[in-house]
Curated annotation (Swiss-Prot):
Function: Together with its co-chaperonin GroES, plays an essential role in assisting protein folding. The GroEL-GroES system forms a nano-cage that allows encapsulation of the non-native substrate proteins and provides a physical environment optimized to promote and accelerate protein folding.
GO cellular component terms, A-Z: cytoplasm
Family per similarity comment: Belongs to the chaperonin (HSP60) family.
GO molecular function annotations of the record: ATP binding; ATP-dependent protein folding chaperone; isomerase activity; unfolded protein binding
Binding site for ATP: T30, L31, G32, P33, K51, D87, G88, T89, T90, T91, G415, D496
Principal location listed in the UniProt entry: cytoplasm
Source lineage: Bacteria, Pseudomonadati, Pseudomonadota, Alphaproteobacteria, Hyphomicrobiales
HAMAP family in the record: CH60
Stated name of the protein: Chaperonin GroEL 4
């Protein structure tokens, strides 16, 4: 086992603080609408330019092991906030730095670290309740656009795209962000249920110009197994032909004689028909077929349920207003399934999302939920260069998470003002002793840090701005760093999601509390390199 180096009390905290400061100082320059960029060197390709706090934090690794421990703990704050709220990583880092700095001073002056931590925890709980009490529910699309704009560093175009996407697919819908092939940013919305399987034969195409199958008011046969001969299907095919409506077959596969017969019948004009493979694999395929059945009020033809193909009747088939099948996608629009059944299925999937521990499963369940609940929106981010596209995509990702969080828990005034105003909740806290009271005061001072930093990044004097904000008691009165004006931040569209502000504070205080109560640090001793061997014969007389 390698030898370890151990540092105690003041020396340990000094090293740790230096690491915290290096990381936090690099991250906090990105805060606010006038935050600066950070350029990150890549081992290959162009450097990456970003204003995303967590991206900066993840790149920092320090040479000194003890300093690095401090930096990594604060990096954990940014990552945790990013995972839960998707935004607010820079605010969390600034808060953590402020609490650790003040806390370390108090411990060095002889206060009890555990009581300080209790005081910090009491203060944070009071602030969180105050934030929740003052959060406003989002009431219209303009507010969603404002949240998106603020989180995308003042880019109104991104805010507009996000508001449009949320409006079209709802809050349960999936919104994905991709890099565009062009310089323009665009939004594409797929309404209805779409899955990534196309027609099994191009002969099924009804619209030759666009190379796709378009059916109005079709029947849908949902079959779990392969179809290789049509004998057992003849009764249902005849019933569909008599009804005069088109038929879409969704099955594990349609092959050989069955596919050939369907194509021949289609070409001779007697049958409006198309066949596609079922989406997904294994158990997920069963679940997705069940989703399609509920959406279209059909039945999955499955041997598990004891239903044979020859016994299928028209009322077991699904129905929809329109179906489009392309080479690689199938879209079912306006299935006739009952609202209650669809809502029940959505609730079931939401429960599974809560229970699952696998990120992959959660992502797939979210996709299924979106397909049932409303649709999928894709924002394609464009730019002139690859570096610009990547930087913009970072901002769109942040803004997307922020808008989701805003719809979930409501909004608060932005610019660090919500935290500054919530300070009044600390006046009534009862503490057991003076050290706990100091812990509460540490949080009181730390809550100014984000507003101060936003002002400094915008070229103003942080103390002056905070002083002016303190003169007014109105919760939404603040300073707009973009315009340099004081006023009602709700009216000016400077708003933050309550979930982001709350998560940033809770994560920052949690890690900062651990750092303040640290008394010893252990790391491996750096290995001393052995001196190079002397060359043979050097300095020898023969």
């Amino acid at each position: 086992m390698a030898a370890k180096e151990v540092k105690f009390s003041v020396e340990a905290r000094e090293k740790m603080l230096r690491g915290v400061d290096i990381l936090a100082n690099a991250v906090k320059v990105t805060l606010g609408p006038k935050g600066r960029n950070v350029v990150i060197d890549k081992s290959f390709g162009a450097p990456r330019i970003t204003k995303d706090g967590v991206s900066v934090a993840k790149e920092i690794e320090l040479e000194d092991k003890f300093e690095n421990m401090g930096a990594q703990m604060v990096r954990e704050v940014a990552s945790k906030t990013s995972d839960i709220a998707g935004d607010g990583t820079t605010t969390a880092t600034v808060l953590a730095q402020a609490i650790v700095k003040e806390g370390a001073k108090a411990v060095t002056s002889g206060m009890n670290p555990m009581d300080l931590k209790r005081g910090i925890d009491l203060a944070v709980s009071a602030i969180v309740e105050e934030l929740k009490a003052n959060a406003r529910k989002i009431s219209n699309n303009a507010e969603i656009a404002q949240v998106g704009t603020i989180s995308a560093n003042g880019d109104a175009e991104i805010g507009r795209f996000l508001a449009e996407a949320v409006q079209k697919v709802g809050n349960d819908g999936v919104i994905t962000v991709e890099e565009a092939k062009t310089a323009e940013t665009e939004l594409e919305v797929v309404e209805g249920m779409q899955f990534d399987r196309g027609y099994l034969s191009p002969y099924f195409v009804t619209n030759a110009d666009k190379m796709r199958v378009e059916f109005e008011d079709p029947y849908i046969l949902i079959h779990e197994k392969k179809l290789s001969n049509l004998q057992s299907m003849l009764p249902i095919l005849e019933a569909v032909v008599q009804s005069g409506k088109p038929l879409l077959i969704i099955a594990e596969d349609v092959e050989g004689e069955a596919l050939a017969t369907l194509v021949v019948n289609k070409l001779r004009g007697g049958l409006k028909i198309a066949a596609v493979k079922a989406p997904g694999f294994g158990d997920r395929r069963k679940a997705m077929l069940e989703d399609i059945a509920i959406l279209t009020a059909g039945t999955v033809i499955s041997e598990d349920l004891g239903i044979k193909l020859e016994n299928v009747t028209l009322n077991m088939l699904g129905r929809a207003k329109k179906i489009t099948v392309e080479k690689e996608n199938t879209t079912i629009i306006d299935g006739v399934g009952s609202k209650e059944e669809i809502s029940g299925r959505i609730a079931q999937i939401k429960a599974q999302i809560e229970e699952t521990t696998s990120d992959y499963d959660r992502e797939k369940l979210q996709e299924r939920l979106a397909k049932l609940a409303g649709g999928v929106a894709v924002i394609r981010v464009g730019g002139s260069t690859e570096v610009e596209v990547k930087e913009k995509k970072d901002r769109v990702d942040d803004a997307l998470h922020a808008t989701r969080a805003a719809v979930e828990e409501g909004i608060l005034p932005g610019g660090g003002v919500a935290l500054l105003r919530a300070v009044k909740a600390l006046d009534n806290i009862k503490t057991a002793n003076d050290d706990q009271r100091v812990g509460v005061e540490i949080v009181r001072r730390a809550l100014e840090a984000p507003a101060r930093q936003i002002a400094e990044n915008a070229g103003a004097e942080g103390s002056v701005v905070v002083g002016k904000l303190r003169e007014k008691s109105d919760f939404s009165y603040g300073w707009n760093a973009q315009t340099g004006e004081f006023g009602d931040l709700y009216a000016q569209g400077v708003i933050d999601p309550a979930k982001v502000v709350r998560t940033a504070l809770q994560d920052a205080s949690s890690i900062a509390g651990l750092l303040v109560t640290t008394e010893a640090m252990i790391a491996e001793k750096p290995k001393k390199d052995a001196p190079p061997a002397m060359p043979a014969g050097a300095g020898m007389d023969f």
